[in-house]
Amino acid sequence: MKRLLILAYDFPPYVSVGGLRPYAWYKYLKEFGVYPIVVTRQWGNKYGSELDYIAPSESTETIVEETECGTIIRTPYKPNLANRLMLKYGSNKFALLRKAITAFYELLQYPFFVGPKSGLYRGAKKYLKSNKIDAIIATGEPFVLFKYASALSRKFNVPWIADYRDPWTENKNRAELPFVRFWERHFMKNAAAMTTVSDFFKMKIGENISLPKTYIIPNGYNPDSVKAVEQTEQCSDVFRIAMTGSINEWHPYKSVISVFAEFVKETNPKIELNFFGINRSEEIQQFAIDNKLEHFIHTYPRMDNASLLENLCRHNVMLLFNDYSYMGTKIYDYLAIRRKIILCYGNDSEAMQLKDRYYPYSLPGKTALSTHLQEDCLNETKAGIVVQDKNHLLSVLTELYNEFSQNGFIECHSINTDKYSRKEGARQLAEMVGTKLS
């Protein structure tokens, strides 16, 4: 059986979309003839918020877990001074000092093995001194893991794979961009192969580096988690719409919430708009208060994927914002639980202005790549409605609410969703490690 060392900073129990991809590899690779060894950091859910990302680990020793799926090496984590100040005094104090310290470590972590993430390198290096493996894969971000994989590859003569969940240099500011571009090119020189989630990202990454052998392994949903909640029924007494994950600046969330508020005031329905684990909770809560919608709009903190799916299943409709050339990750869970999706928006003037101002990705004038991946997916799977603009949204809400009032649920007759399983992604990675790197 081939043995694959996986460098993954985000990993359960930390609640992170980025951790779901390597977790699926860990869970399913062995079924396809590859034994996974995950090197990550120790995580806790002490705060249930972003503070868990910088909280110190409970143990100062490396913890090794052997399970039926594989091996997990959890290295200790000690926050730097900036993070300790944040934990002790909160986000409003020492902001400039914390920013300077963070920038210092950001600069030094590439030429030197320093900073709070370097424990993964030391843990992997110790393991490799006494254990043989066939390949290394590092999943970014954080992209400093590419440095660790590159160094380990040279030291132990093992091929390494760079897994890009997102492009490395796309969203950097102008001052930082030349610096990270240099290091990206430097570390990728000895990569045996590259994986990423879409042809669009492959193209964007190729704008900065000479691409090695590249394989597209999309994101997806965890089939075991979905199976555990497949008998969960929709709510039948209140029409519930759910949205999960980050709300980005190019998302027309203000427009959508305003239309929702208009619908509530016009029809006085039994309806809820619920947000799970979002990054704009305070803003949306304040909007609800200002518009006397506290009983209709709610926000909930982050939760583990299994609990999130259980909650989503009790809703009738899933809200999805348009990410254009980028598929995102939340759409896969929506597809998996077979709840109707409403995509906002397909062609709304206000949304287009937000896209022009904030959207970080661009395509060349002539390309065969799609600029509406989520819309393509919904059309292929028949899983939802592409809402064209805010006027269309009002009519869609009316139609869906009428269907709910009549039936007590919303029908969803989606098809061809099985191919979006993360287990399929693990199979593709196993095939790559087993044959194409040999």
Specify the residue positions occupied by each region the protein language model found.
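Carbohydrate-associated surface elements
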Residues: 200, 220
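Conserved nucleotide-sugar donor-binding subdomain of glycosyltransferases
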Residues: 83-135
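Nucleotide-activated donor-binding/catalytic signature segment of Leloir-type glycosyltransferases, i.e.
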Residues: 277, 282-309
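Conserved donor-binding/catalytic core segment of Leloir-type glycosyltransferases
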Residues: 233-251, 257-258, 425
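A charged, aromatic-enriched C-terminal amphipathic alpha-helix characteristic of glycosyltransferases
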Residues: 386-395, 402-434
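Membrane-proximal helix-turn-helix segments that form the acceptor-binding/catalytic region
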Residues: 24, 111, 115-118, 122-125, ...
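N-terminal subdomain of nucleotide-sugar transferases
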Residues: 1-77, 193, 214, 263-266, ...
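Acidic donor-binding loop of glycosyltransferase active sites
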Residues: 192, 310-326, 339-343, 347
